[in-house]
């Protein structure tokens, strides 16, 4: 977040990050990697150059988008203009053969539905607070909806959890694809 407020800092960070990612991707040639970005980072030239320079490794990289905040300098664009911009960038990344994943928590349903043709995977991270606040039946209905949507649109749907608790076990019992955080 700090880097996004200073273009110079962000530029330096992305150059450093690119070198590190290139080094790791070359060394670990048989591994698949996940790079987490916010959608707002797609507004920056440095992000696009970073991803363009990784095109040779794109089939081994998942770009996982989290959040949907808009940088202050782009707030004058309408929701539709923002959506069109992001769809264009996501299509470009898909054309470059990156695997595109989008977190659905903390963003609008409309945005996720609009981005669906550009995605390979939708992901829901179940936080401890959400588990405690949610009625298990409501949670299962929520999961069922997104699982149905993903199946209908030929996407992978992943529920990311921190540990094996009762709710996690009930999801596994339903055959939902559960991924443990940092796994």
Predicted regions and their residues:
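PAS-family sensory domains
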Residues: 14, 145-148
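The catalytic core of metal-dependent phosphodiesterases that act on cyclic dinucleotides
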Residues: 55-134, 149-182
